[in-house]
């Protein structure tokens, strides 16, 4: 959600797309906050549960991968001169490490909260970003003849 505001681009985002994104994020925030604050029962012992720690580690790792990958993409655009192939970090393995990071991030949230609300958002994130990652990968391969042949779309060595 923050990424478009960090980019300096001559292209415009359609108002409907922006409003739908804001609406979805507001609904998601409300559903997850409501679950955690009213419906979820988290005793203090939950903080020692392996699911909480695994979820927290996945969330932090996904957030880091997402932020670093977005920074790499922003730096590519800052120099002007058209599109270029990103390199380094998660881009060594996949075309859309920012999407992979976001998927890992929200999967971690789902595990840490052990909730239907968290799982629903993780599944939505996968359903939304996996096809976009595949489309980005096709675009890179079609646009750049020397695009790394061993780079996958979303999952290193797999997809």
Spans of features found by a protein language model:
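Hydrophobic transmembrane alpha-helices
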Residues: 41-159
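Hydrophobic alpha-helical cores of multi-pass transmembrane domains in eukaryotic membrane proteins
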Residues: 1, 19-30, 57-64, 107
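Short capping loops/turns at secondary-structure boundaries
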Residues: 9-19, 47-50
């Amino acid at each position: 959600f923050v990424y478009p505001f960090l980019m300096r681009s001559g292209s415009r985002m359609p108002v409907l797309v922006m409003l739908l994104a804001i609406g979805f994020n507001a609904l998601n925030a409300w559903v997850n906050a409501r679950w955690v604050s009213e419906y979820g029962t988290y005793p203090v012992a939950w903080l020692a549960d392996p699911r909480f720690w695994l979820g927290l580690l996945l969330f932090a790792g996904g957030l880091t991968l997402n932020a670093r990958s977005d920074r790499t993409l922003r730096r590519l655009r800052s120099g002007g001169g058209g599109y270029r192939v990103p390199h380094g970090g998660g881009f060594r393995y996949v075309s859309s490490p920012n999407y992979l990071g976001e998927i890992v991030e929200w999967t971690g949230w789902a595990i840490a909260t052990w909730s239907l609300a968290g799982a629903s958002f993780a599944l939505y994130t996968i359903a939304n970003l996996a096809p976009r990652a595949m489309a980005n990968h096709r675009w890179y391969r079609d646009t750049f003849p020397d695009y790394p042949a061993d780079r996958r779309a979303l999952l290193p060595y797999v997809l």
